[in-house]
Amino acid sequence: MGKEAGAAESSTVVLAVNGKRYEAAGVAPSTSLLEFLRTQTPVRGPKLGCGEGGCGACVVLVSKYDPATDEVTEFSASSCLTLLHSVDRCSVTTSEGIGNTRDGYHPVQQRLSGFHASQCGFCTPGMCMSIFSALVKADNKSDRPDPPAGFSKITTSEAEKAVSGNLCRCTGYRPIVDTCKSFASDVDLEDLGLNCFWKKGEEPAEVSRLPGYNSGAVCTFPEFLKSEIKSTMKQVNDVPIAASGDGWYHPKSIEELHRLFDSSWFDDSSVKIVASNTGSGVYKDQDLYDKYIDIKGIPELSVINKNDKAIELGSVVSISKAIEVLSDGNLVFRKIADHLNKVASPFVRNTATIGGNIMMAQRLPFESDVATVLLAAGSTVTVQVASKRLCFTLEEFLEQPPCDSRTLLLSIFIPEWGSDYVTFETFRAAPRPFGNAVSYVNSAFLARTSGSLLIEDICLAFGAYGVDHAIRAKKVEDFLKGKSLSSFVILEAIKLLKDTVSPSEGTTHHEYRVSLAVSFLFSFLSSLANSSSAPSNIDTPNGSYTHETGSNVDSPERHIKVDSNDLPIRSRQEMVFSDEYKPVGKPIKKVGAEIQASGEAVYVDDIPAPKDCLYGAFIYSTHPHAHVRSINFKSSLASQKVITVITAKDIPSGGENIGSSFLMQGEALFADPIAEFAGQNIGVVIAETQRYANMAAKQAVVEYSTENLQPPILTIEDAIQRNSYIQIPPFLAPKPVGDYNKGMAEADHKILSAEVKLESQYYFYMETQAALAIPDEDNCITIYSSTQMPELTQNLIARCLGIPFHNVRVISRRVGGGFGGKAMKATHTACACALAAFKLRRPVRMYLDRKTDMIMAGGRHPMKAKYSVGFKSDGKITALHLDLGINAGISPDVSPLMPRAIIGALKKYNWGTLEFDTKVCKTNVSSKSAMRAPGDVQGSFIAEAIIEHVASALALDTNTVRRKNLHDFESLEVFYGESAGEASTYSLVSMFDKLALSPEYQHRAAMIEQFNSSNKWKKRGISCVPATYEVNLRPTPGKVSIMNDGSIAVEVGGIEIGQGLWTKVKQMTAFGLGQLCPDGGECLLDKVRVIQADTLSLIQGGMTAGSTTSETSCETVRQSCVALVEKLNPIKESLEAKSNTVEWSALIAQASMASVNLSAQPYWTPDPSFKSYLNYGAGTSEVEVDILTGATTILRSDLVYDCGQSLNPAVDLGQIEGCFVQGIGFFTNEDYKTNSDGLVIHDGTWTYKIPTVDNIPKEFNVEMFNSAPDKKRVLSSKASGEPPLVLATSVHCAMREAIRAARKEFSVSTSPAKSAVTFQMDVPATMPVVKELCGLDVVERYLENVSAASAGPNTAKA
């Protein structure tokens, strides 16, 4: 191999990062671009959110220069999957590179800020780069006309999809979409939502008011790197490949590659062959590889040939490039391109290769869409094995035994089918319509017909349904060939298909997947049958079907319909602004939004690593109840990186094995000696880097024993059977209302022992659990923690280490999303990190990988409710009894609070009388904890399930039953006591009536009925639900300090987790000190800085939870300002005697000279008579359900929420929209599944699907209702962080209405004794659940009826 025998030299990677040159020599070949950026450069914008290419937090722009053409190619990429060596001689641009504090912000960053599109901010740099990349891509299209000044060439449709691969858990996406669309030249600016650039309805929406955009303003490829590349090319031409000292090889020909294969060091287990490395996002590396061979530089693998017979794509052509080539082709090619646009996300498609996808499908049970659609198109592949080149059909290639790593896929040929009498269609069913989600089933069908629509040839390909690879349904193909389509023929084809498509044992949703395959085939064949000019009696499913046929066939236009998923996203916001307390009440933009967008905002993992820093990763139990006998490691490269393992034995004398604690008993930090649930921490691996620690933890081998142990308790049913409960303290127990037996005696009708279930939900904060511990002198330690509860974190660390609280300093600046998951659950990571640092006397950092975080998180409480309800014939309910089982997990955590929250939310209706039996079950699963609207969202759902059951039993309109059982103020006081407040503040009834009783609602309901009567395969539903949510006020500290120059520093007990706490506090500070300023304080806004929480600086900080932290922090700041105004007023009056106006700076300078204490630090406690109050809202949602797939599109949601007098309408709007969309996830697609041992198996972005931009309502309207002033509340404001989440119940209820319409149509019933319209739908209502309720066999039964009707009038089935 030329120089192979010589001494190996370490290659140097040269790249530009934001225009600056970097060299990396001797870097491990497994190092990702993200790791390099975050550890070897000042860049912190790209974040590690998942490590799978599934979240977009790490997106960067990569630019490559071709000296032969003098052209630069730019594309977005997922830096967590991109290997550093693969971007040698490339330029990388991050969010800091397009704009920052010093150089000025880019219009993308300014508009994200101005449209209120950043909350916690952790996802914002990735969003920023996805938008920027989309603009660059559009503006580089020379075939498009130049846009008007300030706009891009991007279209609104493209803009909406620009962030389709990016996840955000905070905003609900609507403001992000508006930001994207603001750049589109075809946008109507008046349609964009609330922003800081113009006042809607008062000022014209003009592009001149937006931060000016100029394409090409950012240089993405510096000239110095171009010169280096040109110079290097002259030097290295024809130089043979050399041995690599750092293990990275990049052959330039197939011959060079085979010489590497023949090397003595080549070994399948330690050498990884890569083109883009995106496959590691699906199949994670279990060990470190010490050698990589990059085949992307082999020219033969990058060929693109088009002729009149086929398109040939080299195996390392990116999926994005393949889409570009195929889009400019015939029907089949364009359809393939359309389907590939739904594979992964833009930033993954840009680097993922077409051949890599096919090779994964060949070697592994990978649910490839690429293989399926290419299989149906009759593709062939060329492979090289040793010196032989072989050609196979794709079907033959997939069916071969898995290829070894020496088998090289060269290219893929897709034949030209022409367009005469050819029909090609592809299908996929996935939780996200735009992609970024693996499909339950995918399929592609190609048919060639004669002029009379006789099927001459047909190919039916199915994939992702639970077998090793895509297959062709050949028996069905053979049956259909030569036949004309009829209902009978299609039915027989489906019967054959069901024998062919058989998921392997262990496949989830087995029957659903078969039903999907049937639905897809039916959709294709019925459409084909109806494409004839001859009439057909088969109802074709709605959707877009395009056929290109000969001229003697009627135009296909009659078959094209607009898919609901393609509707543009629209919105409307209504709110009232008040100047009463200005600048409080103004919709100012979020503090720090620009630095969040630029990536300069510092989160825990962004803090530069201290000298000698070590890194930790958890080893967790995979058994639910077992003795832990030992921890060892496999012999591997990763295990060689282990420095030590920290366990319970390392807890100092006097310390406690404690990881969290709340209210009652705590939870152990380590399983010792028994692991009590799968996912429990057993030990912490310590290594030199986070990647080494994470990889070493995977290599841990734990020896377990179940000797003398009882079987684990995993479910509510297990716990009840074995009397395993957590006791509820009497002071936390909810109280019943009235005499249940008397209420039941008054009822005309009764429903007894009906049951409904709700599963768990994962927080999916974008920043996983993180901590950095730095040991200090005299047994002191400082911990930077991503926590909602610094005070508790401090206390627990001190107890764990056995040192005084004052030795522990916990600092938390900002948190990248919390939702309750950074409260009790954050303390485990902080305690483990602190213990390791304390033991080793070196700084230790932990940043959990997404899988570990998901396995250990616990999440929302699963529960089961059994209810008995009595009611009158008019729908008035007289009595309700509820048996409630709550799965708490292994420790109490917040679980004792759950019954009160659940019953509190349930009480939104007047049940007449109410009694309940609640059991908080102790089980061998990870402790469940507080998650946004804990208990309330479940209680509200249970209430709606009961109301809908009653309405169904009486055949009454559901809203009529809801309205009849809403409280009047008298009954509200009976159910809620003092929390009901004043009658003037009870706004629920008026909000509900505004939505449910409006003429518009009645019109929409009538239109839905009309739609359902004329559409067999898609049904719509609409529902309006009320919400009542009780919140509690807690004591909180605050401190306002005025510096000598007049700038102001503020400390509060609350933590900025994205909820806009700092923004509201800043406004309140300006308002509170405004009496000292001529303009009422607005001049002070820019002088206020809210600083990070520090447990040794501000004690008794409490927790950031329960939705009221912002208002209580604001109130304590206001009181601080009152104290400061009292001190400063005499000086102000003295100065005013000499001058009419007093400048702020002069006032403070004089006060400082007079030695006035310019700091105030009160501790606010709520009035004993007003510790809680009620929040109200109502929400209407309209959905469309695809009966054939179970997919749901939310067509419109209208929310009316009572914010009182909002402290900041922009912030509160963001909270309302964001938590509503989080609720949509809970009720629809978020399936937090565990295995039979209770171990979470939906543990990453591939299997756990939070909402993306394609899941939000197509029309999303919010009205912020201003209820009567209430001086007991903080400036008459109300909470917004959690209550609106329960309004997402409206989506679930609307889905039920749509499903009910389908069940009526197809006479679907769960049992012969039950009506088709009465059924329970548990949470989450995923696609398989919806499809099953609509009927898994509706297609077969429909075709049987049609066939029977065709055969004769007396043979049709009912």
Curated annotation (Swiss-Prot):
GO function term, MF aspect, one: iron ion binding
Tissue distribution: Mostly expressed in roots, and, to a lower extent, in mesocotyl, leaves and coleoptile. Accumulates in apical region of maize coleoptiles (at protein level).
Pfam family, one: Ald_Xan_dh_C
Segments of this protein annotated with the region Disordered: 532-559
GO process annotations (BP): abscisic acid biosynthetic process; auxin biosynthetic process
Domain 2Fe-2S ferredoxin-type: 11-98
Stretches with biased composition (Polar residues): 537-554
Location(s) in or outside the cell: Cytoplasm
UniProt cofactor(s): [2Fe-2S] cluster; FAD; Mo-molybdopterin
Cofactor note: Binds 2 [2Fe-2S] clusters. Binds 1 Mo-molybdopterin (Mo-MPT) cofactor per subunit.
Extent of the signal sequence: none
A GO cellular component annotation in the UniProt record: cytoplasm
EC top class, as a word: oxidoreductase
Domain FAD-binding PCMH-type: residue ranges: 241-419
Keyword annotations from UniProtKB, A to Z: 2Fe-2S, Abscisic acid biosynthesis, Auxin biosynthesis, Cytoplasm, FAD, Flavoprotein, Iron, Iron-sulfur, Metal-binding, Molybdenum, NAD, Oxidoreductase
Protein residues bound to [2Fe-2S] cluster: 50, 55, 58
Main location: cytoplasm
Coiled coil: none
pH behavior: Optimum pH is 7-8.
EC number: 1.2.3.7
Activation/inhibition comment: Inhibited by 2-mercaptoethanol, p-chloromercuribenzoate, and iodoacetate.
Role according to the record: In higher plants aldehyde oxidases (AO) appear to be homo- and heterodimeric assemblies of AO subunits with probably different physiological functions. Involved in the biosynthesis of auxin from (indol-3-yl)acetaldehyde. Can also use indole-3-aldehyde and benzaldehyde as substrate.
Known partners and oligomeric status: Aldehyde oxidases (AO) are homodimers and heterodimers of AO subunits.
Family of this protein: Belongs to the xanthine dehydrogenase family.
Protein known as: Indole-3-acetaldehyde oxidase
Gene designation: AO1
